[in-house]
Amino acid sequence: MPETSAAVRGGADLVLELPLPWAISSAEGFARGGVSILAATGVVDTLVFGSECGNIDTLSRIAEIFYTEPEPYVESLRCNLKKGMSFPIARTWALLQYAPSLSDDKDVLSSPNNILGIEYLKALMSRNSKIVPFTTTRVGADYHDKRLGTNQCSAIAIRQSVAAGHDLTYLASQMPENAYEILRTSLKEQKPLFADDFSAALQYKLLTEYFEGYDKYQDISSDLSDRIRNTLPSFTGLSSFCDLLKSKDMTYTRISRCLFHILLNMTKKEFETCKAEYYISYARVLGFCKDAAPLLTEIKKNSSIPLITSLADARQTLPADALRMLNQDILRNQIYLGHLALKNKKEMVNEYRTPIVIV
């Protein structure tokens, strides 16, 4: 688990897994899942997140409007959508129409980390949580900046460079030393996976369920299901299929997320069950720093959900619903690991035998 290793070696005391339904969800689902885990541990009193804005008061004011949904704001949003605006643009204009004093901050909703930060704040509000939020200002390249050679280039730029097979030595000055060494070592050991590596599996899934449609899956409406079916004959790969399906009201990212919901069998029913369990029913430890071992002890004392340090032991300790959710996550992780093994012509890693990262 190179990501976990990079986090712990980079200074994280503890890394917990965000279950896959929320890890590949919208910003709202991602934030709700993350905040739910933190709240359930019983030991977290502060949440710090990065943002382009860097102003917690501005983000909190916007989050409160989005969370409470006052009628004038909702009516403006409804009217803007009827005019044919995409949802992000319609929401921004509705916000400014409701709160003109935010006009100087109209660009806040065009930045991904701001949007996620607002969702963290909404998640805290929804729980009436005592966790205190803070934000730090993002530095370096913008989230969507694909240029290399800038000071602290974006993750997108790094991923594209890896995909293109470029020499990565120049990244040493733009990444934390530990993270760079882990990336370099990992790439020497195996080829990484990209979205298009799942094209064949997705095409098979779409074909086998062609006649029944896809609207049982999370985030997929009957209209999108019909569009997928009608466009399926033009399928040549996952990425290009996203390009064919995207529209003014559905971004490439959202389409990609929907297709992975289909591939990984993530249904609306499953998401509703997760919500009924208040989003999270267990906390799985992926890695921790030796010096932070007392933190695990405190979580075990105070947590409202089981803390998993051994998958083998989880079968005896988890309630039936939680165990079912964990098993689904493991299966989906194995799908990823299986594709990784095929690409590298290696034996598939067994997640049950993968040790926790301890540094």
Region locations from a protein language model:
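Short glycine-biased active-site loop of nucleotidyltransferases that positions the nucleotide triphosphate
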Residues: 8-9, 147
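Active-site cores that bind ATP or allylic diphosphates and position pyrophosphate for catalysis
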Residues: 18-359
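Receiver (REC) domain switch/active-site residues of two-component response regulators
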Residues: 13
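N-terminal catalytic cores of NTP/NDP-binding nucleotidyl/phosphoryl-transfer enzymes
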Residues: 1-3, 9
